[in-house]
Amino acid sequence: MVRVMATGVFDIIHLGHIHYLRESKKLGDELVVVVARDSTARKNGKVPIFDENSRLKLVSELKPVDRAILGHEDDMMKTVVEVMPDIITLGYDQKFDEADLKRKLDQIGVNSRIVRISKYDGNLNSSSMVRKKIMELIGERF
C-alpha cells in the first residue's frame, strides 16, 4: 500500500485545494492530509478564518481524503514519522525547499519521495485570491 501525505492550512476550501488533494490521491492508495495548527499557520503569516478543529473536520469530509490529522506545532518531522508516508506532496505555492526537505527526511531515516503538485488552472485557485475577491465584492457594495 502506498501512503501519500499532503499538508496545508486548508482555510476557505476552494478548487485549488480539491485539485491538490485529488492529484495527491492519484499517487497512492491512502491519502493522509495534515492540517496545520492555528499557531503554525500564524507563524507562517496566515491568519485562519476557521479554527484548526473546524478545518480538520472540513478536510476529513472531502472525497479524496482517507484520513486527516492535525500537525505538530513545533516539528513537522514528528508528524512525518507518525504518518511514515511513501510520498509527500507539496502544493505549487507551498514554501518548501525540496532539497532541504529531502535532507531532513534523510536525517530522520524516512525515505519518502517528494512530489510537487501542479497549479490548478482556474479562477480563485488560492485562499488569498478568494479573500481578495471577497474584499472586492464587499467594496462594491459600500
Swiss-Prot record:
The protein's enzyme class: transferase
EC number(s) on file = 2.7.7.2
Q: Does the keyword Cytoplasm apply?
A: no
- Per its UniProt entry, which superkingdom is the organism in? Archaea
Which residues hold ATP? 9-10, 14-17, 93, 120
Catalytic activity, reaction form? FMN + ATP + H(+) = FAD + diphosphate
**Gene3D superfamilies named in the record:** HUPs
Which coenzyme or cofactor does it need?
a divalent metal cation
Q: Which keywords does this chain's UniProt record carry?
A: ATP-binding, FAD, Flavoprotein, FMN, Nucleotide-binding, Nucleotidyltransferase, Transferase
Q: Which family does it belong to?
A: Belongs to the archaeal FAD synthase family.
Q: How does it assemble?
A: Homodimer.
Q: What does this protein do?
A: Catalyzes the transfer of the AMP portion of ATP to flavin mononucleotide (FMN) to produce flavin adenine dinucleotide (FAD) coenzyme.
Q: What is this protein called?
A: FAD synthase
Q: Which organism is it from?
A: Thermoplasma acidophilum (strain ATCC 25905 / DSM 1728 / JCM 9062 / NBRC 15155 / AMRC-C165)
